[in-house]
């Protein structure tokens, strides 16, 4: 290793250095995989006034869909809106050809909601303080009834 190289430690993330790392990683990833095929996907719940009171945001790539964010305004929680948003999000992704879904969630977020919608924990990372667990959850798309041709 070159003796002229120094490694620095930080308790924050200097923007200029982080930008260099992000750009370099992006270039390496783009050279290795067709990431231009990754597409954003979302759905939102709005009041008649147009105010957004919830949303599901993610991305699709091939037959895979990642739900990255789910949020419902506190005054509209516990009414089934989160489940409706996830179902609409999944239906939209299935229309794109997605057959598999995944997400990451913490134990203080909504793992029980996702379980009720058919997600299972593929991995549990129980290393955080205060008993907090991070889950990686997966769900296959529902099987469709195969079309049969008429005789």
Task: Walk through the language-model features, giving the residues of each.
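Conserved N-terminal entry element of GNAT/NAT acetyltransferase domains
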Residues: 1-13, 143-151
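Conserved active-site tyrosine of GNAT-family acetyltransferases
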Residues: 21, 114, 119
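Conserved beta-hairpin
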Residues: 39-56, 84
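Conserved beta-strand in the GNAT
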Residues: 51-59, 64-71
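Conserved acetyl-CoA pyrophosphate-binding loop and the N-cap/start of the following alpha-helix
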Residues: 76, 80-88
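Conserved GNAT acetyl-CoA-binding A-motif
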Residues: 93-106
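Conserved catalytic-core motifs of GNAT/GCN5-like acyltransferases
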Residues: 102-104, 120-138
């Amino acid at each position: 290793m070159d003796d002229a190289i120094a490694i620095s430690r930080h308790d924050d993330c200097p923007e200029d250095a982080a930008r260099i790392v992000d750009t370099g990683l992006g270039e390496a990833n783009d050279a290795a995989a067709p990431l231009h095929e990754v597409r954003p996907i979302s759905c939102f719940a709005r009041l008649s006034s147009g105010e957004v009171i919830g949303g599901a945001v993610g991305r699709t790539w091939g037959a895979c869909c990642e739900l990255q964010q789910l949020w419902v305004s506190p005054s509209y929680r516990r009414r089934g809106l989160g489940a409706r948003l996830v179902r609409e999000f999944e239906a939209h992704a299935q229309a794109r050809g997605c057959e598999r879904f995944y997400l990451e969630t913490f134990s203080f977020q909504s793992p029980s909601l996702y379980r009720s919608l058919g997600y299972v924990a593929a991995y549990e990372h129980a290393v955080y303080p205060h008993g907090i667990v991070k889950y990686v959850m997966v769900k296959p798309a529902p099987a469709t009834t195969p079309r049969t041709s008429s005789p």
